[in-house]
A protein has these predicted regions:
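Residue signature of alpha-solenoid helical repeat architecture, marking inter-repeat boundaries
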Residues: 6, 44-46, 93
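Terminal, low-structured helical/coil segments at or just beyond the last alpha-helical repeat
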Residues: 96-122
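TPR/TPR-like alpha-solenoid helical repeat scaffolds
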Residues: 50-53, 84-105
Length: 122
């Protein structure tokens, strides 16, 4: 990847992260999808996992608990074995957050604002 495309990827990730962290799930999905189309290998798998988490949150916001739980689990599965991939995101803390949220969803526990996933930049 040349310097220009690396800068473009970082800019795109910054935009996508902000959308995600502002709970703009649909827009974050679109932003991460653009990134997903430009990467491959493990990076692509991580981005796909984040995409799935974003869609899971969209489902959750619409009251679709089953869809949210399934997509959250699939997204977590894609990311948790690839936490060493350097995308400028703290994937370890992200996975911990997702595991806690998944457990609450699976056990039908009450959720609060602090349960929404957050992508922490490194």
């Amino acid at each position: 990847m040349n310097e220009e495309s690396t800068k473009s990827l970082k800019d795109s990730l910054f935009t996508a992260l902000n959308l995600f962290n502002n709970h703009e799930w649909y827009e974050a999905h679109d932003a991460f999808e653009e990134i997903w189309n430009s990467v491959d290998g493990d990076e692509r798998q991580v981005i796909q996992g984040i995409l799935q988490v974003s869609v899971s949150q969209f489902h959750l916001s619409k009251g679709n608990l089953n869809g949210a739980t399934i997509l959250l689990g699939e997204g977590l599965g894609r990311i948790k074995t690839r936490t060493k991939i350097d995308l400028g995101i703290d994937l370890v803390s992200f996975c911990q957050c997702l595991e806690e949220l998944l457990s609450k969803l699976q056990y039908n526990e009450l959720l609060n604002e602090n349960d929404k996933p957050f992508l922490k930049p490194l």
